[in-house]
């Protein structure tokens, strides 16, 4: 059974924990409480299997605290990560600049493929959720961008997250198959 490690990173108060709980069908948190360090959620998704074999997959979703005081822990969090989801609050202009640092640190410096990274513009309840005017600078503008609004259209982000998980698992499966072929030949 394949096991994938996915990091949820991004600025403070961007909605990482709320989104992580929703996507893993964990408990709801009603009041804001900053994540201290990391919170690991383990889950399986029946819609995601390894290739056509129907083999199940396990996931670890690492909900990482957004405070820079945890920066010394980041190398340990990044170890053996298969994917990174950068969550930001689209209604806070400074977050657009901050996600460049998150991308550089968690994707570029780890030599993670861009296809293993997804941006989530999280719109908090009552924010209106304007999806049109996000000016992302290169190389962020090449990444998969998903808007999440759990109040108005919760299933959109769930569907996109499942597609993302499938792409991670397919990549892991192909890599494992290549390694097995090298052993055989």
From Swiss-Prot:
Pfam families: Roc. GO terms for cellular component: centrosome; cilium; endomembrane system; intraciliary transport particle B. It is found in: Cell projection, Cilium. GTP binds at residues 10-17, 63-67, 123-126. The modification Phosphoserine is found at residue 137. Its main location: other. GO terms for molecular function: GTP binding; GTPase activity. Keywords: Cell projection, Cilium, GTP-binding, Nucleotide-binding, Phosphoprotein. One of its GO terms (biological process) is intracellular protein transport. Small GTPase-like component of the intraflagellar transport (IFT) complex B. Belongs to the small GTPase superfamily. Rab family. Component of the IFT complex B, at least composed of IFT20, IFT22, IFT25, IFT27, IFT46, IFT52, TRAF3IP1/IFT54, IFT57, IFT74, IFT80, IFT81, and IFT88. Interacts with IFT88. Interacts with CFAP61. This is Intraflagellar transport protein 22 homolog. It comes from Rattus norvegicus (Rat).
């Amino acid at each position: 059974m394949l096991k994938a490690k996915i990091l949820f990173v991004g600025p403070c108060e961007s909605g990482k924990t709320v989104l992580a709980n929703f996507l893993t069908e964990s408990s709801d948190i009603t009041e804001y409480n900053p994540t201290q360090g990391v919170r690991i959620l383990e889950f399986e998704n029946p819609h995601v299997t390894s290739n056509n074999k129907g083999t199940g997959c396990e996931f670890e979703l690492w909900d990482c605290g957004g405070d820079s005081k945890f920066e010394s822990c980041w190398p340990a969090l990044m170890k053996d990560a298969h994917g990174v989801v950068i969550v930001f609050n689209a209604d806070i202009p400074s977050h657009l600049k901050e996600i460049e640092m998150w991308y550089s640190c968690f994707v570029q410096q780890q030599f993670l493929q861009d296809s293993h990274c997804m941006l989530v513009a999280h719109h908090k309840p009552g924010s209106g959720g304007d999806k049109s005017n996000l000016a992302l600078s290169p190389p962020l503008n090449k990444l998969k961008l998903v808007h999440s609004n759990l109040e108005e259209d919760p299933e959109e982000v769930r569907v996109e997250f499942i597609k993302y998980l499938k792409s991670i698992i397919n990549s892991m499966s192909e890599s494992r198959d290549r390694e097995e072929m090298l052993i055989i030949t």
